Amino acid sequence: MQNRTGILILTGVIAAICIYFLSFTFVSRSIKADAEAYATNKQGQFDRAKEQRYLDSLWKEPVFLGSTLQEVTERELGLGLDLQGGMHVVLEVSPADILRSLSGNNRDPKFNEALKQAGEDQKTSNTSFVDLFANNFKKLAPDTKLATIFATSANRSKINFQSSDTEVRKLLNDEVNGAFGRAFQIIQARVDKFGVANPNIQRLPGSGRIQIELPGVDNPERIRRLLTGSAKLEFTEVYRLNELAPAIEGMGSYLLREETARKATAKASTPATGTTAQGNSLESQLAQGSKKDSTSKSDTAAASAQGTALTQLFLPVGQDQLGVYLKDTARANAVLNAPEVRSLFPADAVFAWDRKTFKATDGKEILPLYFLKKPGGRAPLEGDVITDATNDYDDRGRPEVTMNMNAEGARKWKSLTAANVGRPVAILLDNLVYTAPNVQNEIPNGRSSISGNFTVEETKDMSNVLKAGKLPAPTTIVEESVVGATLGSEAVSAGVLSSVVGILLVFGFVVFYYNRAGVIADIALLVNLFFLLGVMASLGAVLTMPGIAGIVLSIGMAVDANVLIFERIKEELELGKTFKQAVSDGFKNALPSIIDSNVTTFLTGIVLFIFGTGLILGFATTLIIGILTSLFAAIFITRLLLEYYIRNGKTLTFSSTWAKKLFADSDFDFVSRRKLYYTISSVIIGAGIISVLFRGFGLGVDFKGGRSYVVRFEKAITTDDVRNSLEGVLGASPEVKTYGGTGIGANQVKVTTSYLVDDNSAGADKRAEATIYKGLSSLKGNPAHIESSQKVGPTIAYDILTSALWSILLAVAVVFVYILIRFKKLAFGYGAVVAMFHDVLIILAIFSIFNGLLPFSLDVDQAFVGALLTIMGYSMNDTVVVFDRIREYLNENRGKKESIPTIINNALNSTLSRTAVTGFSTILVLLVLFIFGGETIRGFSFAMLIGVIVGTYSSLFVATPIVVDALSNDQEKDNGTPTTIEKKTGFDAIPADFTSAEATTPEEFTAKKEKKAKTPLIRPSQS
């Protein structure tokens, strides 16, 4: 073996790097185990806060090779959300709000209608929002230039009223893209300060979206606030209620007229004494500012009626704010925004809600309402003047946020506080009043604080977002997935079990089949596994459940390289060559097939990596790394081990006694029965098409949009009971499937619904979850808990579906081009592509036909698409190995009196042993994954299991016959002139009896040969 020393050095270097990076994982796990033990008392009770204190104490301390615990944690092989719990979020920066801001909040009805229509169109289009808006605006206002909307004073340095629509579009696209970049930086800063170990934040190219993965978080609502709050900080004056007395009295008149018009008979009870902060009636507060002095009975009665109508909705909770029962806030918003009511208030008056409710003495929750003074619609002081913000404690020991301002901010703050001594100044964050303290004296130093009824976490988050800065536009969550820690730990157990069992079975089978040589293969496979994990750790990759599936599958497929090598060595030994020469020639002959087969799977993995997100990205990562490490292990490690035997004068046996004659002298006729195989495949595909037309697929939530919840009950539950309990509260029947069980005695279900899927408001997720709990509460005596949740908006569902289709088409195109380049003949490309489409259609048919009939989910989702692409890669792996052997046999028999069908049949029989061993070992692994891998990948592993069986079938009974037919259709012979079939195959001569008058078809030729005693072209030693 040449360069043996160099390969040994390279292997040692790679091993040292892997040990170095994996050591961080072991140290991190050890410290976390110590923290868990420290936080668990003798009774077995676990204190999470105590564990966190232990970890925090070491966070900045050196714990390993000079690295702090924080650095060790960042370098460990991280676990994905599905294995340790956490939250996956995809944020979308609102382009509509950016355009509104650029227009100066233009109220043109056609402009706003175009924005609205663009939002609807974006749900089913890949066109940019700006182009959709511009097209809609052109339809609504064909004679109006975009410049009339966007040529504001703020934009005059870039465009003017004479600017063309093209110039305005360019500005809008630049601003939207710039806002996306700024939003990404701000979100990244917020997440980095949040303190999550190994967060993953990345842009999703071409989509204007940001993907965030936060392992281990257990407070989704806090994360939602952190990510979606725009951090718009404002300081503004507050109107006293007596200063707005005429307007509020007029609002009472409006409510009275509205009540009379509706002829409402039911009246809400007046709040009980003690529900207000002041104890004074609203009427008495307003009277302080009223100039009227009429005391006539009719006026008094009218005023009383107005006051009653007013206090039924708006309650007095202080001299600076009203209050509204939490359940009545929607109606209050409608009243305050009514044009008739809005006209009663000063032009600079705006209303804003407090961030928190308080409980009245009657137990009901009241939300305070403030009337703020914003001349020109803008606050006199905004958050862009803040230079620093820290969470601290006030003089009463309460958590607060202290802020420092720049020079301009300090000057404005001094002026604002000086003008409002003895009056309140409100501090708002994202249009919610956080505090409105009375100013005691002017504040000259640019310092201010936000204090109130806050927790330490709230002040920490508040200071975080203020320091990170204001988002250029609001963000909305278009996709969300929350995995509970319990579900994650179960996935870890299932993943470890399936991995260990699968790998042990493969190791055992290899030794059982190849005898002592199998031990060498197993050592190479172990090295492959070690390198794979080490490379993943060095790249900062995250291990997910599909990632574990990818590792186990790569081990199964890595067997193929060793099988190809061993089969070739066996052939050379049986030709009488020495062990040393047989090893050398065996590696040389096996290498083309190994490279070709792995390149096709590698290309499929690249497509998955480009188009995949979340769990599929994890699978693609491990698949790509696994292919590279398995190639290195098979080509170099196996060779080094065999060279060790050669140097010590030892030999090896490459087959067990029972396996030696298993495929010896096999003479199966693959070609002549090809029409039967075509018919079998056509029937299955036809049945699948009928099923798709009448039954369709069970689409996953990531393809159809909606909300999905995994719910665990204390006791066994039926899907019908869950469906019936939720139908009333959700307004429609949800989809309910058993999750993680066989349906009998199962206590987990997966609920999918479209409830509030289009609602991107701050409280939509919480309301949806509360509605689910409300419905499930009717199942008396069987408490339920939501273990995980997922939300996918309609826009992102469309994008996911589109990218999935493109990924499949791209994979087909890439593999076709590679086959064409490698084999230089269209016939082989046709066979490979037809076989790929055959495999995909068969899997689709099975998933449609058996959907709802099997005791596990057959949803078509992103994981399913990943399985399809992997199946295509595996099928190509198998097909290319077969094609390589066919090409070799055709070259060996060039110009001989043998037909193409006979040559191809012999080639297929010679590789039958390799096909069977590789297929069986891979199926063995997938069967273990299917049984023990857990619900997360059950549908995925089922698709893979069926796919490997179908892929093995198609390489022998579809791809190869297609090649034969493609060549047979051009049977020509012209007295020494190269025929079309010769041109297609690149051979010098066509076998005479393939085109003779005696046997004009492959079937006739085969029948003729069966009547004769023939010497097969296949070597007796081949198996």
Where are these regions (language model features)?
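Hydrophobic alpha-helical transmembrane segments of membrane transport and translocation systems
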Residues: 8, 527, 534-535, 571-592, ...
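Non-transmembrane, solvent-exposed regions of membrane trafficking/translocation machinery
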Residues: 22-31, 53-64, 71-430, 434-437, ...
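Pore- and gate-forming transmembrane helices of large, multi-pass membrane proteins
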Residues: 187, 486-506, 525, 557, ...
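Juxtamembrane "pre-transmembrane" interface segments
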Residues: 213, 445-449, 457-501, 766-817
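Transmembrane helices with small-residue packing motifs
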Residues: 15-55, 69-81, 92-102, 664-715
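Cytosolic juxtamembrane regions of multi-pass inner-membrane proteins
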Residues: 556-600, 643-651, 855-917, 965-977
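Small-residue-enriched core segments of transmembrane alpha-helices in multipass membrane transport
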Residues: 12-15, 519-540, 551-558, 615, ...
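Interfacial segments of transmembrane alpha-helices in multi-pass membrane proteins
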Residues: 3-4, 401-402, 406-421, 425-426, ...
